[in-house]
């Protein structure tokens, strides 16, 4: 009998374990510890947040609570083993108090750091009592794990408020309707960057080492490329080439540039946030029309003006026409192509401008190649997928019309630039000054008024399809909402405020005792505008009656200086806002043949290429949690910001000398 007691005890324990296990998975759920009745977060659940402050995660009355005072993307995740090519139902009861902005309370599969797959439920905002939220997914052919997340907000759809979750389940389903509606996880947006067994510490170390690698590669490649261009410029200029040869060579440059960007697209797949937005926004407009785009629930955070949304819709429509699957490499490259087309357009404009200024055919080809292979442009339209080159092209087209005295068409193009990116408004004071200073007779005043009317008409026409049931001036409110959407001193822009520790810091914090970042930024923005307009006034008086066509640098240099100074010392700056300045400086060089302006453009290209590379990496889904805010990130930010500030001071010296002093320096 004594021998049987241990055996009976062991059998009893085994039975107890089976009973408990059965109770835990009585409903077939694959989640473990989904009962949030304990005062602490159960084992197996991990918390991840985009913003590291102003949120809390806790359990209360058998529910998981996620509360965030500021808009954030907070998720509580559990890694679950699943079967490949199988349909699963993810569900949970949710309730909310005062949830606003972005996606709201939702469920998701967040496999970005595993295999690139991602799916999210519809989500809900506002205040509501318990209701069930469901997400149906089909695992990929090679997927064995999914990262299930209870979530407040989502990627690029941050939310604030209090969200509650209970009765979370992850079960396999054979329901025909659910199988038909399942979201496929078999199209990863990014290659795998993490193994299941990799520790968080090892992953963080690896991702930080990638940051170092990207920085070194960017610096070396950008410097070698630009040094090669600059050192051999005289050799290019001295070559004799007829227009037909130059045309053939330029076509070869364009094809080579496209191939280079295709390689970068295949390697990087675009910036995960932005490419996801491009595809989702284009799909939304194609399927639901433009009228509800800005007003549908959860769309309050959409901060881009409507102009480029029409381009995204056109790209999506073409992809559907040719049956190219969304998320494929071909689709991602298609969303990259408009920006590269703008790069080519900038090169053509620069070549035409230089030809009019007396440059040889070979010299024009040199400048065109410099635009096509500009490191910052290559990264932006090849690796990232952003559209600042489109804004730059529109600004240059408007400037070119103004050079020829065509004020009305210049105004219309400027209106289109505003509808493409809000940052076009930064150039408004300099353009307004040029319009007003060039009024000499009644006809000039009428054409100036016509230019303003043309800009407003284009803004109204482009925004009209998106108005829906909003007022006629809805676009003004959308601009002000977007302007305050990133209340930071610097948003990964390596400038003076970032050098002073303001990167991703609230603009309300103090740069110095009694001086908030925002107040300092406003003063410097006003100073930049005043200096730029003064430069225009002085240069016009000095040059007498010469037209803008004869002296285009009278607009190009103040515009470049104004934006560069605002970027360096202003608040709310993103890393890409200074992009058009590179082209403006290159055009100013073609207008004056002042080599210092070409050097400034090249230096800024290196600075911006470095800023883009690190920003694209630091803000990516895969690396942000492991890299952003670390000591390595702070060191990189400090060094790069110092480089940017020094580049600005060199450029400012050249611009101020030309604007207030020298008339000619070849």
Report each predicted region and the residues it spans.
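Perimembrane helix-loop-helix junctions
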Residues: 2, 427-457, 467-469, 580
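Start-transfer (signal-anchor) and selected internal transmembrane alpha helices
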Residues: 2-17, 25, 203-263, 355, ...
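Aromatic/glycine/proline-enriched transmembrane-helix motif characteristic
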Residues: 18, 218, 233-243, 347, ...
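Extracellular and organelle-lumenal recognition/adhesion modules and their flexible linkers in secreted
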Residues: 25-213, 512-515
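Transmembrane helical bundles and short interhelical boundary loops of multi-pass, membrane-embedded
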Residues: 27, 187-219, 227, 249, ...
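Extracytosolic helix-loop segments that constitute the early lumenal/periplasmic catalytic or substrate-binding loops
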Residues: 276-303, 307, 317-324, 469-478
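Specific aromatic-rich, kink-prone transmembrane helix
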Residues: 348-352, 390-407, 584-585
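Membrane-interface transmembrane helices that cradle and orient dolichyl/undecaprenyl
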Residues: 356-361, 396-409, 439, 545, ...
């Amino acid at each position: 009998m004594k021998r049987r007691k241990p055996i009976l005890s062991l059998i009893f324990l085994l039975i107890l374990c089976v009973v408990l296990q059965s109770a835990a998975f009585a409903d077939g759920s694959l989640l473990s510890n989904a009962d949030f009745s304990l005062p602490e977060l159960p084992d197996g659940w991990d918390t991840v947040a985009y913003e590291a402050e102003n949120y809390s995660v806790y359990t209360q009355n058998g529910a998981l609570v996620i509360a965030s005072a500021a808009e954030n993307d907070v998720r509580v995740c559990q890694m679950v083993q699943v079967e490949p090519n199988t349909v699963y139902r993810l569900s949970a009861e949710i309730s909310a108090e005062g949830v606003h902005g972005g996606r709201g309370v939702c469920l998701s599969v967040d496999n970005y750091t595993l295999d690139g797959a991602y799916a999210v439920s519809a989500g809900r905002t506002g205040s509501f009592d318990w209701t069930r939220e469901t997400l149906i997914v089909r695992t990929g052919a090679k997927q064995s794990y999914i990262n299930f997340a209870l979530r407040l907000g989502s990627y690029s759809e941050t939310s604030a408020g209090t969200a509650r979750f209970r009765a979370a389940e992850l079960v396999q389903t054979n329901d025909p309707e659910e199988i038909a509606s399942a979201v496929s996880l078999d199209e990863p947006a990014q290659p795998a960057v993490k193994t299941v067994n990799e520790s968080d510490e090892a992953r963080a170390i690896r991702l930080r080492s990638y940051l170092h690698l990207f920085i070194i590669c960017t610096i070396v490649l950008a410097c070698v490329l630009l040094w090669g261009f600059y050192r051999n410029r005289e050799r290019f200029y001295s070559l004799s080439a007829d227009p037909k040869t130059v045309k053939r060579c330029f076509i070869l440059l364009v094809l080579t540039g496209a191939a280079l960007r295709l390689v970068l697209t295949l390697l990087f797949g675009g910036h995960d946030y932005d490419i996801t937005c491009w595809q989702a926004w284009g799909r939304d407009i194609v399927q639901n029309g433009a009228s509800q785009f800005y007003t549908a629930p959860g769309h309050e955070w959409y901060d881009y003006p409507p102009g480029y949304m029409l381009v995204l819709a056109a790209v999506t429509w073409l992809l559907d026409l040719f049956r190219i699957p969304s998320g494929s490499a071909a689709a991602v490259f298609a969303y990259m192509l408009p920006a590269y087309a703008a790069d080519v357009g900038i090169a053509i404009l620069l070549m035409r401008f230089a030809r009019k200024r007396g440059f040889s055919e070979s010299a024009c080809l040199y400048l065109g190649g410099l635009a096509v292979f500009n490191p910052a442009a290559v990264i932006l339209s090849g690796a990232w997928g952003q559209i600042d080159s489109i804004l730059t092209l529109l600004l240059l087209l408007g400037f070119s019309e103004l050079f020829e005295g065509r004020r009305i068409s210049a105004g219309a193009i400027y209106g289109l630039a505003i509808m493409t990116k809000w940052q076009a408004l930064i150039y408004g004071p300099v353009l307004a000054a040029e319009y007003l200073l060039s009024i000499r007779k009644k006809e000039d005043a009428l054409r100036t008024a016509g230019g303003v009317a043309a800009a407003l008409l284009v803004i109204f026409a482009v925004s009209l399809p998106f108005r829906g049931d909003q007022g006629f001036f809805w676009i003004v409110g959308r601009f002000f909402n977007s302007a305050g959407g990133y209340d930071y001193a610097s948003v990964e822009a390596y400038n003076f405020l970032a050098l002073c520790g303001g990167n991703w810091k609230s603009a309300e914090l103090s740069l110095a005792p009694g001086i908030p970042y925002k107040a300092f930024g406003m003063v410097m923005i006003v100073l930049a505008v005043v200096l730029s307009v003064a430069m225009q006034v002085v240069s016009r008086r000095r040059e007498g009656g010469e037209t803008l066509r004869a002296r285009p640098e009278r607009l190009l240099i103040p515009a470049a200086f104004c934006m560069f100074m605002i970027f360096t010392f202003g608040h709310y700056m993103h890393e890409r806002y200074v992009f058009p300045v590179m082209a403006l400086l290159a055009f100013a060089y073609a207008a004056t043949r002042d080599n210092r302006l070409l050097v400034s453009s090249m230096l800024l290209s290196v600075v911006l290429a470095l800023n883009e590379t690190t920003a694209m990496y630091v803000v990516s889904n895969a690396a942000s949690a492991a890299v952003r805010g670390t000591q390595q990130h702070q060191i990189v930010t400090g060094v790069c910001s110092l480089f940017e500030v020094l580049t600005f001071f060199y450029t400012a010296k050249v611009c101020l000398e030309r604007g207030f002093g020298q008339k000619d320096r070849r």
